[in-house]
């Protein structure tokens, strides 16, 4: 898809649009659903800097070991495997450096395109493109704050406490900041 060539913000938009069968025909939904975050990892030295800055302490004061090669990388963050000082195996999610600037710039472009579609394309207003982009803006910007994601995860864990059907990993709230989240592996 052309959205992949435009970068991670547009890929995330396409992924979000894949759930909007009320707005697009099935053939579009099927194509949007194929979008993946094919994003290379960012430099592990930057990940370490972000972790140390967020936690306000050296990496090895928190972790017994930290795998500098990420387990996974996506458009918003990447994930590293680590072991806490107490021996617990964890994953460390780290938000990409400068991703908020990139996303805000891309959203400005999306808003301009949405206004053009709404105002100049026949039937464009039916798709409500400005509304879709505004909703997307709220959603993607909230994804950048890992404290919110951690709080949602903790609520989910409480909701399913005692369940044999679903297991929600423990989140180490003492190691959660806007840009990092540490959770059970």
Task: Please give the residue ranges for each predicted region.
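Broad phosphate/nucleotide-binding scaffolds in NTP-utilizing and phosphate-metabolizing enzymes
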Residues: 1-185
């Amino acid at each position: 898809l052309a959205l992949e060539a435009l970068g991670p913000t547009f890929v995330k938009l396409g992924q979000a649009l894949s759930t909007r069968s009320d707005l697009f025909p099935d053939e579009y939904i099927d194509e949007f659903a194929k979008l993946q975050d094919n994003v290379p990892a960012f430099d592990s030295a930057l990940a370490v800097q972000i972790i140390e800055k967020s936690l306000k302490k050296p990496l090895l004061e928190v972790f017994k070991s930290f795998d500098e090669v990420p387990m996974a990388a996506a458009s918003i963050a990447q994930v590293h495997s680590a072991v806490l000082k107490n021996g617990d195996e964890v994953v460390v999610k780290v938000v990409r450096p400068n991703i908020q600037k990139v996303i805000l710039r891309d959203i400005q472009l999306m808003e301009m395109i949405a206004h053009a579609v709404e105002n100049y394309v026949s039937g464009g207003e039916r798709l409500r493109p400005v509304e879709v982009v505004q909703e997307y803006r709220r959603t993607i910007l909230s994804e950048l704050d890992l404290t919110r994601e951690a709080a949602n995860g903790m609520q989910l864990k409480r909701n399913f406490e005692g369940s044999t059907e679903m297991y929600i990993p423990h989140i180490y709230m003492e190691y959660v900041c806007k840009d990092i989240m540490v959770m059970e592996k």
